[in-house]
């Protein structure tokens, strides 16, 4: 071990070099024990592997290739940002910017003012606030508008969105009290009417985008709920979750309400995510009536939850693409991947398979498969796709998956039928050479 460490590049800290050497030796021993190692190794190869691992692990957060077919993959960073968003990030993040400076009068401005005009055009909302995620958005809204009051929520909408983030707990954390309305499968307008008291502070709608209650169900129309809320001087708050700006039905997807639609139907405040169906950075976007947004701006929580210049820049650039629907569909990677046809996926699969076919000891096939949208969106809907299917007598499916994951650029696959599936919906053409190089290294 000491002899090896002395020959490693001195630019790396001793601790990191030692850890990398131990990992390489452990991997080599494992290959020998499992019988997957067919050639002997010497000191030169060990040093090469250690050097490679040190270079790869310079940073913990790394780029990966998503071969799972899940477009909005939470574990892999959710939505990819567009090329135009990247340009805007470079322009504003590596230089000074007018983040909180009004260029017209030279005085201090608001970071949120950069989004007001574009949000008005896209949704019709009077004002906008942005915090670091939708959970924070819901917390800020309730803390600002319903503290020490009751919040009416249908029992069928008392959801958990993941990570133990539950609507009842959020209401309690924000200082309010939950008032459950109706039943799990049926809630009528009269249920809300009967639940109204002098303590009621708001009516909350939670869009169940990550699950479905089907069959014998009923829920009042938003327009009726808005009329009831406004007749009692209450705000109607809508947690829309994923947050669509475009109607996705032309792509064969089921109907989901857009932000503009729910605002037009009378909702006073709407919250949604930036990094799901919108295809932007992680953010919690709050849009709605100015009188309610102004109350949120005075909440001390806002300072703790506010977004930075990079998130703001990326979000503005993403929203700008939606001013032209055609451009959004072509330029926002999330929408582009969702919109890929079955034929497009087959064409990509054929191209990748042709590149991999010459590799010895690797079986390469093309199979019809299904992709998921992910991110808690369209839970029941699968997208038809094609996958390149890899198998080998030399490695089990689990071992091959591990080796792909340990590549210089980690490749994340899905195991099915004892094979590794690479779904072409979530793999770009530019990533094909990297996949080939990784497999050449594995099967050399």
Task: Locate each region found by the language model.
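Short Gly/Ser/Thr- and Asp/Glu-enriched loop/turn motifs at secondary-structure junctions
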Residues: 1, 65-69, 278-281, 383, ...
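Long amphipathic alpha-helical segments
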Residues: 1-57
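Glycine-rich phosphate-binding segment of PLP-dependent enzymes
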Residues: 26, 67-68, 78-104
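N-terminal Rossmann-like NAD(P)+-binding subdomain of aldehyde/semialdehyde dehydrogenases
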Residues: 57, 63-80
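A short linear hydrophobic-aromatic micro-motif
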Residues: 60-61, 272, 409-414
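Conserved PLP-enzyme active-site core in the AAT-like
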Residues: 106-322, 357, 438
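Structural motif of enzymes handling amino- and sulfur-group chemistry
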Residues: 291, 299-300, 307-356, 369-370, ...
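Conserved C-terminal alpha-helix-loop-beta "cap" of PLP-dependent enzymes
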Residues: 342, 346-428
């Amino acid at each position: 071990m000491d002899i090896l460490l002395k020959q490693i590049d001195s630019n790396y800290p001793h601790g990191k070099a030692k850890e990398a050497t131990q990992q390489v030796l452990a991997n080599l021993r494992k290959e020998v024990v499992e019988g997957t190692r067919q050639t002997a190794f010497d000191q030169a190869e060990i040093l090469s592997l250690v050097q490679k691992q040190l270079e790869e692990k310079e940073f913990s957060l790394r780029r990966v290739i998503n071969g799972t077919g899940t477009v909005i993959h939470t574990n892999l960073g959710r939505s990819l940002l567009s090329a135009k968003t990247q340009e805007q990030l470079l322009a504003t993040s590596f230089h000074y910017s007018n983040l909180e400076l009004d260029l017209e009068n030279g005085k201090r401005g608001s970071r949120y003012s950069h989004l007001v005009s574009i949000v008005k055009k896209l949704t019709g909302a009077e004002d906008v606030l942005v915090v670091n995620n939708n959970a924070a958005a819901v917390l800020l809204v309730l803390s600002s508008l319903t503290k020490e009051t009751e919040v009416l929520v249908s029992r069928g909408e008392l959801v958990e969105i993941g990570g133990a983030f539950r609507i009842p707990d959020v209401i309690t954390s924000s200082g309010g009290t939950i008032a459950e309305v109706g039943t799990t499968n049926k809630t009528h307008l009269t249920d809300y009417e009967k639940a109204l008291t002098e303590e009621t502070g708001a009516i909350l709608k939670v869009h169940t985008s990550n699950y479905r209650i089907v069959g014998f169900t009923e829920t009042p129309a938003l327009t009726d709920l808005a009329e009831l809320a406004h007749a009692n001087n209450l705000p109607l708050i809508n947690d829309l979750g994923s947050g669509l700006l475009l109607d996705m039905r032309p792509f064969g997807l089921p109907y989901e309400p857009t932000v503009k639609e729910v605002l037009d139907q009378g909702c006073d405040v709407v919250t949604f995510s930036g990094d799901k169906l919108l295809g932007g950075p992680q953010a919690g976007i709050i849009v709605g009536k100015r009188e309610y947004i102004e109350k949120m701006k005075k909440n001390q929580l806002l300072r703790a939850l506010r977004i930075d210049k990079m998130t703001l820049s990326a979000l503005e650039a993403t929203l700008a693409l939606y001013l032209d629907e055609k451009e959004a569909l072509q330029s926002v990677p999330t929408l582009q991947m969702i919109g890929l046809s079955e034929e497009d996926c087959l064409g990509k699969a054929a191209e990748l398979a042709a590149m991999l076919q010459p590799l010895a000891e690797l079986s390469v096939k093309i199979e019809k498969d299904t992709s998921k949208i992910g991110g808690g969106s369209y839970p029941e809907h699968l997208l038809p796709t094609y996958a390149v299917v890899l198998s080998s007598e030399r490695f089990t499916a689990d071992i091959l998956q591990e080796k792909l994951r340990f590549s210089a650029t980690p490749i994340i696959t899905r195991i099915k039928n004892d094979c590794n599936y690479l779904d072409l919906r979530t793999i770009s053409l530019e990533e094909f050479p990297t996949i080939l190089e990784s497999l050449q290294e594995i099967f050399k």
